[in-house]
A protein has these predicted regions:
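Cytosolic-side transmembrane-helix boundaries in multi-pass membrane proteins
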Residues: 1-31, 219, 223-226, 296-335
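Helix-loop-helix hairpins and the membrane-proximal interhelical loops
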Residues: 14-56, 244, 248-253
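Transmembrane helix-bundle core of multi-pass membrane transporters
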Residues: 16, 133, 138-200, 227-230, ...
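Hydrophobic core segments of alpha-helical transmembrane domains in multi-pass membrane transport
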Residues: 24-37, 65, 90, 115-119, ...
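Single transmembrane alpha-helix segments in multi-pass membrane proteins
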Residues: 33-38, 43-97, 101, 128-135, ...
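Alpha-helical transmembrane segments within multi-pass membrane transporters and channels
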Residues: 98-145, 288-292
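Helix-loop-helix "hairpin" substructures at the membrane interface of multi-pass membrane proteins
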Residues: 107-115, 121-126, 179-254, 265
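Transmembrane alpha-helical segments in multi-pass inner-membrane proteins
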Residues: 239, 249-315
Length: 335
């Protein structure tokens, strides 16, 4: 070996790894170990199942939000697409059950397609408005949020929709496979799909290119409008899938599921290091961030911390995450 060979110091290698992956994996491990040691109820089977199931819904939702953020967009409507898909799918299943009560597979299929279709409709409105009409993503998705919320409430009058096939509720929503909730496998499948798109497809490369520099991508021949629409469609479809999974778990269509879904999906993306300016974001980090948020929330629930304080604390965590990642990126660029 030549004396001129230069090897980076271990500390530099560790720092570059930190700059690439951020603080999240370390903090997540520390949090889990601390909870296991000091909060005995955290390791109960029921609590672990609840965390895994809740994390799965947020992972699916956040993967879609990340896709829109990568192209430099923003989607406030995901929190309304979830209940919209919930009530639409439930209403269609109840209707189909009355028409053909013995055709469970067809009943479920029609409901699922209707729920996903509602997500596609919202995503199409958002995508076309942003890509072709040049409407601000914030404004158009805020409008879609209001529309989707209003439609869901109008369809149900705020009353839960019961009567879905028990095979759908017990088999998919509350079922276990290899001792894990089925929602976990659904989330894992979607994460694998998004990871594949990001790393091995033309669409993945183009989405990053659009978020990095829209004008340069256009000059390079990328059909930027088409891929912008696809990004918003993909985001809304994943929100609808999350809504379908939640509906199956709850056992009814709900027009009001959670007021914080949009905030949580954005928080997971930001904590994961997804750039709000576009062009940066990895689905594996978003998955870890979703787990981090749900474990943190679960810990505060177990410790009986006031929900109002929880909201403040989570907001502080988001701000701190953005600050730490920004410092790490600046130091990495200097080195």
């Amino acid at each position: 070996m030549s004396s001129l060979d230069v090897h980076p110091a271990p500390s530099h290698r560790l720092y570059r790894a930190y700059a690439r992956f951020g603080f999240l994996p370390t903090v997540l491990v520390i949090l889990v170990v601390a909870l296991a040691l000091f909060v005995p109820r955290f390791l109960t089977v029921q609590n672990i199942f609840n965390v895994l199931r809740s994390s799965a819904y947020l992972v699916i939702l956040s993967a879609g939000q990340m896709t829109v953020l990568i192209v430099g967009g923003f989607d406030l409507s995901v929190g309304a697409v979830v209940p919209l898909a919930s009530v639409v799918s439930a209403l269609v299943m109840v209707w189909a059950k009355g028409v053909a009560p013995d055709q469970t597979a067809i009943i479920v299929l029609l409901g699922v397609l209707a729920g996903i279709g509602s997500g596609l409709a919202v995503g199409l409105i958002n995508g076309l408005s942003v890509a072709f009409l040049k409407v601000s993503p914030f404004i158009v998705t805020l409008g879609s949020l209001s529309i989707a919320t209003g439609v869901a409430l109008l369809l149900t009058n705020g009353i839960p929709v019961y009567g879905m096939p028990q095979a759908y509720v017990n088999g998919f929503g509350r079922g276990l496979w290899l001792q894990l909730p089925t929602a976990v496998y659904l989330a894992a499948l979607i994460v694998a799909l998004v990871w594949f798109i990001q790393n091995f497809t033309r669409m993945g490369r183009y989405l990053y290119a659009i978020g990095g520099n829209l004008q340069a991508a256009t000059v390079s021949g990328v059909r930027t409008r088409t891929y912008l629409v696809l990004a918003y469609l993909f985001c809304s479809v994943l929100a609808a899938v999350s809504g379908l999974a939640l509906t199956a778990q709850i056992g009814s269509g709900q027009a009001v599921i959670s007021a914080q879904l949009t905030l949580e999906s954005i928080a997971a993306a930001v904590i994961a290091g997804v750039s709000l300016k576009g062009g940066v974001g990895r689905v594996e980090m978003v998955t870890l961030a979703a787990f981090f948020l749900l474990i943190l929330t679960d810990a505060m629930d177990l410790l009986k911390i006031d929900p109002r304080i929880q909201t403040i604390f989570l907001g502080c965590i988001v701000v701190l995450a953005v600050a730490l990642d920004e410092v790490a990126k600046r130091r990495a660029s200097v080195d």
